[in-house]
From Swiss-Prot:
Localization, UniProt: Endoplasmic reticulum membrane
Secretion signal span: none
Membrane-protein topology: Single-pass type I membrane protein
Cytoplasmic side: 65-579
Residue numbers on the Lumenal membrane side: 1-43
One MF term in the entry's GO annotations: lipid binding
Protein name according to UniProt: Maintenance of mitochondrial morphology protein 1
The organism's place on the tree of life at top rank: Eukaryota
Transmembrane regions listed in the UniProt entry: 44-64
Lineage of source species: Eukaryota, Fungi, Dikarya, Basidiomycota, Ustilaginomycotina
PANTHER family (UniProt xref): SMP-LTD DOMAIN-CONTAINING PROTEIN, TEX2 PROTEIN-RELATED
Entry note about domains: The SMP-LTD domain is a barrel-like domain that can bind various types of glycerophospholipids in its interior and mediate their transfer between two adjacent bilayers.
Annotated organism of origin: Mycosarcoma maydis
Record note on quaternary structure: Homodimer. Component of the ER-mitochondria encounter structure (ERMES) or MDM complex, composed of MMM1, MDM10, MDM12 and MDM34. A MMM1 homodimer associates with one molecule of MDM12 on each side in a pairwise head-to-tail manner, and the SMP-LTD domains of MMM1 and MDM12 generate a continuous hydrophobic tunnel for phospholipid trafficking.
C-alpha cells in the first residue's frame, strides 16, 4: 500500500530524486592525503644544512670580500683623493700667486725701492743665478740634452748591484758577518755542504730581528722558513729629469725584481684576562713576495755652502766637549725615492687555531699585503726618501782643528767612536721628507705646479705676436747647443722651448744689468695680479717666483741689451721632455 503511494509521489515530481551512494571505509580512507615519507631526523638535518649554507654564503659575500676587488677599490679611492688634493693645491697656488703679484705691483708703484735697499734679496738672486748656471754648465760639458737624449740601459749597474746583493745575501744566510773573516787568498772551502747550517742561521738571524720588540699579548716569534731568493733586480731606462725650477736634476731608473722571497713564522696570541694566558690562539703566517717593479728616483742634494751653521752628526750633544769633538755633517746627500705608481705582487698564507683550524683566510692575506704596501709608501715613496749621507771630505778649518784636537786627546780610548758616530769618512743612512712646494717637480712630471699654472694662464694668441726677439751675447754664442745662459737653462728645465728659432737668450751678466737698470720693477702691459704677458730675458714665459729672476718689459730690455749681437742660429726649438 505504501509503495504505490511513494511511486505516485515520484511520478508527480518533475524529476526523480537522487540518493548518494554510501562509500565503504576503504574507499573513504583512499581519498585522504598520504603521510610524509620524511622522518623527523631527516627534516632536522636538512634544515641545519640549509642554515649552514646560508651562513657560509653570508660570511663569504658579506663579511669577507675578494682581494682583487678590495685592491681595485683602494686604488680608485687613492686616485680620487690625489686628484682632489691636486685641484685644491693648484687653486690655492693660483690664488697665492695672484695676491703676491698684486701686492708686489702696488708696493712697487707706491714706494719704488731701489735694488741697493735690498742687499739680502739681491745676494739671494745672485746665488740662485750662480747655482742655475752651474747646473746648466754640467749638462753642457757632459753633452746631455734633456729634450732629445734617449733612455739608457744600465747593464753595468745590474752586474755591479748583483755582486753586492750576492755578498750581502751570503752574510744573511750565514747569520751575519763573522769577526774572523778571511780574504779570498786564504779562504779554505769547506768540504761539507752548508745548506742546512745556512738555513738555520738565517732563521736565527730573523728571529733575533723580529723578537727585538716584545709585547704581553704575543709569544716569542719562531721563524719556520726564511728564503731570500736567488734572482737580482734589473735596472733599465735610465734618464735625467729636472727636479725643480732652479735647475737641479734627478736620475730616474725603472727597476723590476721577480723572485721568491718567503718568510714564515709561528707564534701564539695570548689573552691575559681574567688571568695570564687565559686563552691561547696558535697563529702561523707566511708572506711571499713574487714581483716588485717601479721607478727609482736618485737625486744628489747639496745644501747651501755659505750657511753659517751646518748640521752636526750629533743633534743633541750631552756636553760642550762632545759637541766640539763632533764634526759638522756633510752637506752632500743622495736621496732615493720611489714613484707612487709602483707594483707589488705578493701572497700570504695563514693558519689559525689548535683543534679546529682556519686556513688561508682572505682577510688576513689582504691585511698583510696592505700593511706591507703601506710600510713602503710611508718610508720610500716620494716625497719621502731614503738618504745616504756622503763623506765630508773637505771640512771647514775651524771644525777640522777642533776635531783633530779631540781625536788626538782620545786616540787610545775611543778611536773608533768617530766612525760609529758619523764623523769623517763615514757614510750615514737615514730617512726624510722632501719639500713639496710649487717649485718642485714631482717624479714622473715634466713641469712644476707653478710652471703648469703659468703656461695654462699664458696660452693666448696675442702673446706670440707681441713678443720681440731678444739677442744673444757673445758668451752665450759660444754654446753650440743653446745652453749658455741661466735663462736658457731654466727655460730648458721647464720644457717651454716652443717659440720660433730666432728668439735668443741673454747671459747672466745681461740679466744682472737688466735688474740694475730696471730696479726690479717687472713692468708689463697687464693688470696687477695677472700671470700672463710677462717678459723674461731669454724669450720664455715665467714668473718672478718661478724663475728667480727680476723681470722687465721688452721696451726696457731693448734699452739695455746690445743691438748688434744677433746670432744666426739662435736657440733650438725644444719640445717638452719625453718620458
Amino acid at each position: 500500500m505504501q509503495q504505490p503511494q511513494q511511486q505516485d509521489l515520484q511520478i508527480g515530481l518533475p524529476y526523480a530524486p537522487v540518493q548518494p551512494p554510501i562509500p565503504s571505509p576503504a574507499a573513504y580512507f583512499a581519498y585522504l592525503p598520504s603521510p610524509s615519507r620524511w622522518t623527523f631526523t631527516q627534516g632536522l638535518i636538512v634544515g641545519q644544512v640549509s642554515m649552514v649554507i646560508v651562513a657560509l654564503l653570508l660570511i663569504r659575500y658579506v663579511i669577507f670580500e675578494d682581494s682583487a676587488t678590495a685592491l681595485e677599490k683602494e686604488r680608485l679611492m687613492r686616485l680620487k683623493v690625489s686628484q682632489r688634493r691636486s685641484k685644491l693645491h693648484a687653486k690655492a697656488l693660483l690664488q697665492d700667486a695672484r695676491k703676491a703679484n698684486s701686492a708686489a705691483a702696488s708696493a712697487a708703484a707706491a714706494a719704488a725701492p731701489s735694488p741697493a735697499s735690498h742687499p739680502l734679496r739681491k745676494s739671494h738672486r745672485l746665488a740662485s743665478d750662480t747655482r742655475a748656471s752651474m747646473f746648466a754648465n754640467i749638462l753642457d760639458k757632459t753633452a746631455y740634452d734633456l729634450s732629445s737624449h734617449l733612455p739608457e740601459s744600465a747593464d753595468w749597474l745590474n752586474v755591479m748591484f748583483a755582486q753586492a746583493i750576492a755578498g750581502y745575501r751570503e752574510d744573511v744566510l750565514t747569520g751575519g758577518v763573522s769577526s774572523h773573516h778571511h780574504t779570498a787568498s786564504d779562504a779554505i772551502p769547506s768540504p761539507n755542504p752548508l745548506e742546512p747550517q745556512k738555513e738555520r742561521t738565517a732563521r736565527d738571524l730573523m728571529e733575533e730581528i723580529l723578537n727585538r720588540a716584545t709585547s704581553s699579548f704575543l709569544d716569542p716569534i719562531r721563524v719556520t722558513e726564511a728564503d731570500f731568493g736567488d734572482a737580482y733586480p734589473i735596472f733599465t731606462n735610465a734618464r735625467v729629469r729636472p727636479a725643480d725650477d732652479t735647475g737641479r736634476t734627478r736620475i730616474e731608473i725603472d727597476v723590476d725584481y721577480s723572485d721568491q722571497i718567503t718568510l714564515a713564522i709561528d707564534t701564539k696570541l695570548l689573552i691575559n684576562f681574567p688571568k695570564p694566558r687565559f686563552a691561547v690562539l696558535p697563529v702561523s703566517l707566511g708572506l711571499t713576495i713574487v714581483r716588485f717593479s717601479g721607478t727609482l728616483a736618485i737625486e744628489l742634494f747639496s745644501s747651501d755652502p755659505n750657511a753659517t751653521v751646518l748640521p752636526t752628526a750629533n743633534p743633541n750633544p750631552s756636553s760642550s766637549s762632545s759637541s766640539s769633538a763632533t764634526p759638522p755633517r756633510s752637506r752632500h746627500q743622495l736621496h732615493f725615492s720611489l714613484h707612487p705608481d709602483f707594483a707589488l705582487e705578493a701572497s700570504a698564507t695563514s693558519l689559525l687555531g689548535s683543534r679546529a683550524k682556519l686556513q688561508d683566510i682572505p682577510k688576513i692575506e689582504q691585511l698583510l699585503i696592505s700593511r706591507l704596501r703601506g710600510w713602503i709608501m710611508d718610508r720610500f715613496v716620494w716625497p719621502r726618501y731614503w738618504s745616504l749621507t756622503l763623506p765630508n771630505l773637505v771640512p771647514s778649518p775651524a771644525a777640522s782643528r777642533s776635531f783633530s784636537a779631540a781625536a788626538a786627546a782620545n786616540r787610545h780610548t775611543d778611536a773608533a767612536s768617530v766612525g760609529s758616530s758619523g764623523g769623517h769618512g763615514q757614510i750615514n743612512v737615514g730617512t726624510g721628507v722632501e719639500r713639496t712646494d710649487a717649485s718642485v717637480i714631482q717624479p714622473g712630471h715634466h713641469e712644476s705646479a707653478r710652471q703648469e699654472m703659468l703656461h695654462a694662464a699664458s696660452e693666448r694668441p696675442s702673446l706670440a705676436s707681441s713678443r720681440p726677439p731678444h739677442v744673444r751675447s757673445s758668451s752665450s754664442g759660444l754654446r753650440a747647443n743653446g745652453m749658455g745662459s741661466v735663462e736658457a737653462w731654466r727655460a730648458h728645465a721647464a720644457g717651454v722651448y716652443n717659440q720660433p728659432s730666432h728668439q735668443h737668450a741673454t747671459s747672466l751678466n745681461q740679466a744682472a744689468l737688466l735688474r740694475a737698470h730696471v730696479g726690479g720693477g717687472g713692468a708689463t702691459d697687464c693688470a696687477p695680479g695677472s700671470d700672463v704677458n710677462i717678459e723674461v730675458p731669454g724669450s720664455y714665459r715665467g714668473s718672478v717666483a718661478g724663475a728667480g729672476i727680476e723681470l722687465a718689459s721688452s721696451s726696457n730690455a731693448s734699452s739695455v741689451l746690445p743691438t748688434g749681437a744677433h746670432h744666426s742660429s739662435g736657440l733650438r726649438n725644444r719640445p717638452g721632455f719625453v718620458q
